[in-house]
């Protein structure tokens, strides 16, 4: 039966010229291969090769004009933070390092210096206004100042001269009290702007003068 099928196939198929293999310089090119026609049972089994498309690559692999070999591939991303990815067009925030911190410190110091200079200028401008109105000195009367102060350094005591007001007040006190207590001496010294020693000496001299005058009066009476 196999021989019958083979004979029937041989009779129905037309004479086909032998296929001649040609040597081609470029194996990737299919245009140089001749088309062949085959028939089986009245069916056309011819093989046709489409014209090749322009290619920029070797070994029949097409490459687009775009330098990116894989256009569908997503852009490279950089992890800016955990769980967040940045694209190529996005700029990842830079972490300021030691050099950036050092560069920022001089700017802060300059701002602090400038603010300090401004405050000093304001203080200087405010001073003349305060100096234009000096506080009035307290009024001091003559008996409030300590007079007859010795400034000599030779060891000799200078003779104390009392004012009329001081002499009058001391005479009044001597008329009532010929001997003063220490507490009373301090009060008189403060009132007359004298020291305790000056009051004590004045009363000693005044008592001696009073005794001398009393003796002379007693002699005249005899």
Curated annotation (Swiss-Prot):
This is Homeobox protein Hox-C5. Residues 74-85 have a biased composition (Low complexity). The gene is Hoxc5. A motif (Antp-type hexapeptide) lies at residues 140-145. Its main location: nucleus. Belongs to the Antp homeobox family. Gene3D superfamilies: Homeodomain-like. It comes from Mus musculus (Mouse). CDD domains: homeodomain (cd00086).
